[in-house]
Amino acid sequence: NLAVGSHLVCLPGTHSKWVGVRDGRIQRIATAMTGELYAVLRQHSILGRLMPVDDTRFDAFAFDAGLRRSEQAGGMLHHLFGVRTAGLFQQIAEPALPSYLSGLLIGHELRASGAFSQKPRPAQVHLVGNDRLLASYAHALTSLGIGVQRHPEDLAAHGLHALWSRRSATRSNADV
């Protein structure tokens, strides 16, 4: 229940959403193109040529290395070039490169969301989405010492329906 207190909700996907909620009211929304950027880099860049076609295998060690790299100086563009270097010099095995790239991008997304520089830092993030995406985000958040509560992907549709119903009811009452 998000009706009382401050909460942070993440809806990972092609365009991930970060929603700050206080006492049941949306305070802020931030969007990141993490999923789309991952797909573009995998399918249409020199990085994708270094990786296997099938990227369904999750390598926790490589993912964590990407998360750690995202914390370091240099910025995301420099870090992305480092993915190429790691692949060319076999510092990270080819099958693990997609997990490394994913960890790097998600790590940058977490930091860019601004939620983790707040004081106090959120103790928990509500994750809404499919199990595969939630697993990566849950892994990243728990590695940062932040708890997660998972919610099914249809929760977002239910929430939008509730907002629409409330809006429609408000308009109907205003017409009276």
Give the ranges of each region predicted by the language model.
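Glycine-rich phosphate-binding loop plus the immediately following alpha-helix
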Residues: 1-8, 12, 17-69, 73
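Short active-site-adjacent structural elements
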Residues: 17-19, 114-115, 134-138
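Conserved active-site and cofactor/substrate-binding residues in soluble primary-metabolism enzymes
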Residues: 32, 36, 75, 97, ...
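Phosphate/pyrophosphate-binding loops at sites that engage ATP/ADP/AMP, CoA/4′-phosphopantetheine
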Residues: 110-121
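Glycine-rich phosphate-binding loops at beta-strand->alpha-helix junctions
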Residues: 122-140
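Glycine-rich phosphate-binding/hydrolytic loop that grips phosphoryl groups
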Residues: 149-176
